[in-house]
Amino acid sequence: MAVMAMFPLGSVLLPGGILPLHVFEPRYRDMIRDCLRADGEPEFGQALISHGWETGGGDDRLMVGTVAQMLQVEAIDENRYALVAVGTRRIKINAWLPDDPYPMADVDDWPDVDVDAPGLAVDVAASHARVRAARALAAEVSALLDDSDETDLAAGIGGEPIDTGDDEISDDPLLATYHLATLAPIGPADRYRLLAAPGPVERLDMLDEILDDVEAMLKFRLS
């Protein structure tokens, strides 16, 4: 077990995912400075807020997260940092500690199980095709809507904006399952379920079930 600085957010970072942050709260500015002063690569944990807000504290936080390694950090001025981090590995949160002076938790690394399951690469390719199709549907629906309806559509898939950018994934089948979970046009609650899946096989099965619902909703919007 290890104590790790934590950054709870209303979104889910997965291994291999990129996390840009604009840090302005004093407690998180202190956290960034402490992480940069620590030995080794500067990193912190990221976890999903289930209820509450990102600023001010008093939020409820879930118990599976991802370690975020800081790649770029820029002090915009004495009160703000801009940083970019990448998700490196999954963690299980054993206990949330007092926010003193910023959120911290007792965590363990939580590696995936059955990472060498037979046929995993084939299943990844099939899921990749489904994710691409769902993203194309989401882009088609988005193109038909005005700004207010796009907000409604984002709410319908979980409150996150629709990403229509690059959809390439890793050649490593395990990391690719996380990339697919990041790319899929789904909301943070479903993305968290995929993060918490025991291994890549379960993650792909769950992703297929989630995409069934997403595709049905998008096709309904097009009908």
Feature-to-residue mapping (PLM):
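N-terminal low-complexity, acidic/polar interaction/targeting segments
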Residues: 1-223
